[in-house]
Amino acid sequence: MSFGTLYTHNPTPRSTTLIALAKLHNLDVKIIHAEKKNKEAFEELCRYNPLGQVPTFVGADGFVLSECIPLTLYCNDERSSLRILQWMSFANSDLFPAVGGVFLPRIGQRQIIQQDDGDSLRAMLQRCKYLDEHLKRSRYLVGESITIADFFAASLLMGAFAAFRRSMQERFGALCSWYDGVLEIGWFKKVAGGVPDLGLELEIPEDIKW
């Protein structure tokens, strides 16, 4: 029985955990890549989300839900805590734009938010350091047990690790150990695994204070 349809882009880290959860729970979810260039799919998406935002989910019963955080919790059917929401919100609103601001220009793509490269680099380093310090004290983001917050945050860090794996390892050991552990979880690895190593150097100018 169909669970519903997920409109997304290919790729987009904001949908990685959603798709992995659907597979974990054996949910029959139709995946539609609704970029603007796919005119028919994009027009279909806009019938449910006039802004054309992804991810957007349309249930078999017509229930419509968008935004990656509520969608992830909905697919997981997990009783959320405020701390899980805290880390998911941080990853989505702070970490992901910061990583994108550094990663995307270095592979020839447009930044998520237009800002100075130095500001982008400082923001990414500060947020990675924040996570690294937290993970020195805690095995996972929310205590000693893995939660959906870990999978969600790890998926939004893929760009940073794909581009700057060696530099991330040198500077943020606890963060790297956590990230590698999360990506080794079987059901998640089936969807999120195979992150390429682009081997880019993360050069930090002396005037960048973080």
Swiss-Prot record:
Domain GST C-terminal: 77-200
Signal sequence bounds: none
Enzyme superclass (EC): transferase
Family: Belongs to the GST superfamily.
The UniProt record lists the keyword Transferase: yes
EC number: 2.5.1.-
Cellular component GO terms held in the UniProt record: cytoplasm; nucleus
Pathway terms, separated by semicolons: Secondary metabolite biosynthesis
Deletion consequences: Impairs the production of monodictyphenone. but still enables the production of intermediates untill emodin.
InterPro entries for this protein: EF-GSTs (IPR050802), Glutathione-S-Trfase_C-like (IPR010987), Glutathione-S-Trfase_C_sf (IPR036282), Glutathione_S-Trfase_N (IPR004045), GST_C (IPR004046), Thioredoxin-like_sf (IPR036249)
Pfam families reported in the protein's UniProt record: GST_C, GST_N
Domain GST N-terminal: 2-83
Coiled coil: none
Organism: Emericella nidulans (strain FGSC A4 / ATCC 38163 / CBS 112.46 / NRRL 194 / M139)
UniProtKB keywords: Transferase
Protein name: Glutathione S-transferase mdpJ
Role summary: Glutathione S-transferase; part of the gene cluster that mediates the biosynthesis of monodictyphenone, a prenyl xanthone derivative. The pathway begins with the synthesis of atrochrysone thioester by the polyketide synthase (PKS) mdpG. The atrochrysone carboxyl ACP thioesterase mdpF then breaks the thioester bond and releases the atrochrysone carboxylic acid from mdpG. The atrochrysone carboxylic acid is then converted to atrochrysone which is further transformed into emodin anthrone.
GO molecular function: transferase activity
